[in-house]
């Protein structure tokens, strides 16, 4: 049982507010939550917070805060599951979850909340059940066109019409407008991996972790059977390695409840009959052992003179992806000592950009080709830079420098090596139009840290 539900923007502006029981302090509770959230040290706030006799449970999704409050002694895990399900429902019915989308569909969001929760008690979170009661149509920013090549693919990757669907096609509502009789039968399947890496100052690998998901968004009628074929060398745990090759191994794996595993052990095929909307077909994790080299290596060189306050940092970034692959939206973030007053730079290509901001150096590289190597020479004046005793140049890093962190996106690449071999649909619509199938693979950084 929950007392209130509200959605805040990243700046704390209330977008949605619903009081189910009338036992709270009104809209001031949303402001109280954001003050407590921003008053906490660090970037990671706890998902459960308390104030007097009230509990706040929240998740962050697409830059929004989805918050539930209760004064009862309820398991926080059940409320976190409810918030996650609400985020999925909003994405299903509005097309995507974001500040602009919520603002355009306020009436639809309130109608969903009225059907999902009655006096704070959950009635249903099923997309299929709710579609019988929801009357408000979603408001989208523009009509969706599958072959609108002015759009770009997932995470900004350039796409080809015959291979990848524009990103807008996957972000439309699962329920078409009642005036739109041309609802397309489509399935979008994404293999998404988040890479966490920690590299020591001597270049040795201290930690590596891959968190992966196979995400499905289906516009087919509910219960339509589909089969997803994974890489045949895919195995779970070291004891399950098969054949003579290194195999594609993960440490842990979990499946959605709608997945049938009768063909998984023998042929690595997932069979399922999903409902309309979004779901995570499979989650997996891999630690310590990657089948391929890390996507990036950084080779830093530091020279600083305490007497003159001159700091020189030379960074060489090597991309170890295959030559036909590329990384997009690469950004290197390097914390700097306090008091930097000037920056001069020499970059290896004109597309790069570097600037100072919030006590750090930001080096942006829009596109990095696999097998390439880029460099940047940065000279800064730091008066009164603290450090070990002595004058003259030093090759040791001064206090406050580093560690460096990288953010990037790798379209059509998975760090674990897992690939979808095929996506087969048993559904056959009336007429000659076959369902459209879109499969995408991508990896992106989660925490890619290199010590200086």
Swiss-Prot record:
<dbReference type="InterPro" id="IPR011012">
    <property type="entry name" value="Longin-like_dom_sf"/>
</dbReference>
<dbReference type="GO" id="GO:0006895">
    <property type="term" value="P:Golgi to endosome transport"/>
</dbReference>
<dbReference type="GO" id="GO:0006605">
    <property type="term" value="P:protein targeting"/>
</dbReference>
<feature type="domain" description="MHD">
    <location>
        <begin position="184"/>
        <end position="451"/>
    </location>
</feature>
<dbReference type="InterPro" id="IPR050431">
    <property type="entry name" value="Adaptor_comp_med_subunit"/>
</dbReference>
<dbReference type="GO" id="GO:0006886">
    <property type="term" value="P:intracellular protein transport"/>
</dbReference>
<dbReference type="GO" id="GO:0030124">
    <property type="term" value="C:AP-4 adaptor complex"/>
</dbReference>
<dbReference type="InterPro" id="IPR018240">
    <property type="entry name" value="Clathrin_mu_CS"/>
</dbReference>
<dbReference type="GO" id="GO:1903361">
    <property type="term" value="P:protein localization to basolateral plasma membrane"/>
</dbReference>
<dbReference type="GO" id="GO:0030131">
    <property type="term" value="C:clathrin adaptor complex"/>
</dbReference>
<keyword id="KW-0653">Protein transport</keyword>
<dbReference type="GO" id="GO:0000045">
    <property type="term" value="P:autophagosome assembly"/>
</dbReference>
<keyword id="KW-0813">Transport</keyword>
<dbReference type="GO" id="GO:0005829">
    <property type="term" value="C:cytosol"/>
</dbReference>
<dbReference type="InterPro" id="IPR028565">
    <property type="entry name" value="MHD"/>
</dbReference>
<comment type="function">
    <text>Component of the adaptor protein complex 4 (AP-4). Adaptor protein complexes are vesicle coat components involved both in vesicle formation and cargo selection. They control the vesicular transport of proteins in different trafficking pathways. AP-4 forms a non clathrin-associated coat on vesicles departing the trans-Golgi network (TGN) and may be involved in the targeting of proteins from the trans-Golgi network (TGN) to the endosomal-lysosomal system.</text>
</comment>
<dbReference type="InterPro" id="IPR036168">
    <property type="entry name" value="AP2_Mu_C_sf"/>
</dbReference>
<dbReference type="Pfam" id="PF01217">
    <property type="entry name" value="Clat_adaptor_s"/>
</dbReference>
<dbReference type="Pfam" id="PF00928">
    <property type="entry name" value="Adap_comp_sub"/>
</dbReference>
<keyword id="KW-0472">Membrane</keyword>
<dbReference type="GO" id="GO:0031410">
    <property type="term" value="C:cytoplasmic vesicle"/>
</dbReference>
<keyword id="KW-0967">Endosome</keyword>
<protein>
    <recommendedName>
        <fullName>AP-4 complex subunit mu-1</fullName>
    </recommendedName>
</protein>
<keyword id="KW-0333">Golgi apparatus</keyword>
<dbReference type="InterPro" id="IPR022775">
    <property type="entry name" value="AP_mu_sigma_su"/>
</dbReference>
<dbReference type="GO" id="GO:0005802">
    <property type="term" value="C:trans-Golgi network"/>
</dbReference>
<dbReference type="GO" id="GO:0090160">
    <property type="term" value="P:Golgi to lysosome transport"/>
</dbReference>
<dbReference type="GO" id="GO:0005769">
    <property type="term" value="C:early endosome"/>
</dbReference>
<comment type="subunit">
    <text>Adaptor protein complex 4 (AP-4) is a heterotetramer composed of two large adaptins (epsilon-type subunit AP4E1 and beta-type subunit AP4B1), a medium adaptin (mu-type subunit AP4M1) and a small adaptin (sigma-type AP4S1). Interacts with tyrosine-based sorting signals on the cytoplasmic tail of cargo proteins such as APP, ATG9A, LAMP2 and NAGPA. Interacts with the C-terminal domain of GRID2. Interacts with GRIA1 and GRIA2; the interaction is indirect via CACNG3.</text>
</comment>
<comment type="similarity">
    <text>Belongs to the adaptor complexes medium subunit family.</text>
</comment>
<dbReference type="InterPro" id="IPR001392">
    <property type="entry name" value="Clathrin_mu"/>
</dbReference>
<dbReference type="GO" id="GO:0008104">
    <property type="term" value="P:protein localization"/>
</dbReference>
């Amino acid at each position: 049982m929950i007392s209130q539900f509200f959605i805040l923007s990243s700046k704390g502006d209330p977008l949605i507010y619903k009081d189910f029981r009338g036992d709270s302090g009104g809209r001031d509770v949303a402001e109280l939550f954001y003050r407590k959230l921003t008053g906490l040290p660090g970037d990671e706030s706890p998902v459960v917070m308390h104030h007097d006799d009230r509990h706040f449970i929240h998740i962050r999704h697409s830059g929004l805060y989805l918050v539930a409050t209760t004064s009862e002694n309820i398991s926080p895990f059940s409320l976190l599951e409810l918030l996650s399900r609400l985020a999925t429902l909003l994405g299903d019915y509005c097309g995507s979850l974001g500040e602009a989308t919520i603002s355009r569909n306020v009436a639809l969001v309130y109608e969903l909340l009225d059907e999902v929760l009655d006096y704070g008690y959950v009635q249903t979170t099923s997309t299929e059940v709710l579609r019988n009661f929801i009357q408000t149509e979603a408001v989208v920013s523009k009509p969706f066109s599958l072959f609108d090549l002015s759009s770009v693919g997932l995470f900004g990757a350039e796409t080809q019409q015959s291979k990848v669907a524009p990103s807008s096609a996957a972000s439309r509502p699962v329920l078409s407008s009642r005036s739109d009789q041309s609802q397309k039968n489509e399935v979008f399947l994404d293999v998404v991996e988040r890479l966490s890496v920690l590299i020591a100052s001597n270049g040795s690998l201290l930690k590596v972790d891959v968190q992966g998901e196979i995400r499905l968004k289906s516009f087919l009628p509910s219960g339509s059977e589909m089969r997803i074929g994974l890489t045949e060398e895919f195995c779970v745990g070291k004891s399950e390695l098969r054949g003579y090759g290194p195999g594609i191994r993960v440490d842990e794996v979990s499946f959605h409840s709608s997945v049938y595993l009768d063909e998984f052990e023998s042929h690595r095929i997932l069979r399922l009959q999903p409902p309309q909307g979004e779901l995570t077909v499979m989650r997996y994790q891999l630690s310590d052992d990657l089948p391929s080299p890390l996507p990036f290596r950084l080779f830093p060189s530091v020279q600083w003179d305490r007497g003159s306050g001159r700091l020189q940092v030379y960074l060489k970034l090597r991309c170890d992806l295959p030559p036909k692959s590329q990384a997009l939206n690469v950004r290197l973030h390097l914390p700097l000592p306090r008091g930097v007053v000037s920056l001069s730079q020499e970059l290896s290509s004109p597309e790069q950009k570097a600037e100072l901001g919030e006590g750090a150096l930001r080096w942006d590289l829009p596109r990095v080709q696999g097998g390439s190597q880029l460099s940047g020479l940065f000279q800064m004046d730091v008066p009164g830079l603290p450090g070990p005793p002595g004058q003259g140049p030093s090759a040791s890093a001064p206090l406050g420098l580093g560690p460096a962190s990288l953010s990037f996106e790798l379209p059509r690449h998975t760090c674990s090596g897992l690939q979808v071999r095929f996506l087969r649909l048993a559904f056959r619509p009336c007429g000659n139009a076959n369902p459209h199938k879109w499969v995408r693979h991508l990896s992106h950084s989660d925490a890619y840290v290199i010590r200086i």
